[in-house]
Amino acid sequence: MKFFLDTANVAAIKAINELGVVDGVTTNPTIISREGRDFETVIKEICDIVDGPISAEVTGLTADAMVEEARSIAKWHDNVVVKIPMTTEGLKATNILSKEGIKTNVTLIFTVSQGLMAMKAGATYISPFIGRLEDIGTDAYQLISDLREIIDLYDFQAEIIAASIRTTAHVEAVAKLGAHIATIPDPLFAKMTQHPLTTNGLKTFMEDWASFKK
């Protein structure tokens, strides 16, 4: 399984990348806006840090606008993946871009039908949202399981990016269900390394070693 960082904070990306567990980065207009910096500059800086797919999202709403923007974004770096919203216009754009060899990440997927349509259109990645589905009482884990089953059954080349990850339990569950990738907010990476028994165990080891060395 691959781990992507769901942030555009360059300092956080640098720090977490040193752990050796980051395979890529995802961003969206909200995440970019939080940084208050030029979109292109931020994406290029991220590409210089992480050697893996870096998702940058279009903001156009028509297929023509998305394609035009995507072509420009794709030129920023070889690792850039263009994020496209799951709409009819987004599907049109994804189809065009896939034929041009531009990698796409179709986002805001909440149903099996949406995921299937995105894969048929040629998406490189599909991003079903875990937390947001749970917010409305829908079984997000079943969606991941169903999408993975369809990919394996029909040999689609698209990979599942489990998005809207909020807890370590989310990461663990989607890993077991076969999501190819989990995109994780930077604060959650630290939580994934921690457990009280680990902390207490290390404390005991150090205390015992200090007593032994006296």
UniProtKB/Swiss-Prot annotation:
GO annotation, cellular component aspect: cytoplasm
Active site, per annotation: 83
Catalytic activity: D-sedoheptulose 7-phosphate + D-glyceraldehyde 3-phosphate = D-erythrose 4-phosphate + beta-D-fructose 6-phosphate
Gene Ontology biological process terms in this record: carbohydrate metabolic process; pentose-phosphate shunt
InterPro entries: Aldolase_TIM, TAL/FSA, Transaldolase_3B, Transaldolase_3B/F6P_aldolase, Transaldolase_AS, TSA/FSA_arc/bac
Keywords noted in UniProt: Cytoplasm, Pentose shunt, Schiff base, Transferase
Compartment(s) of residence: Cytoplasm
Superkingdom per UniProt: Bacteria
Pfam families for the chain: TAL_FSA (PF00923)
Known EC number: 2.2.1.2
Pathway annotation: Carbohydrate degradation; pentose phosphate pathway; D-glyceraldehyde 3-phosphate and beta-D-fructose 6-phosphate from D-ribose 5-phosphate and D-xylulose 5-phosphate (non-oxidative stage): step 2/3
UniProt function note: Transaldolase is important for the balance of metabolites in the pentose-phosphate pathway.
Family: Belongs to the transaldolase family. Type 3B subfamily.
Name of protein: Probable transaldolase
Primary gene name: tal
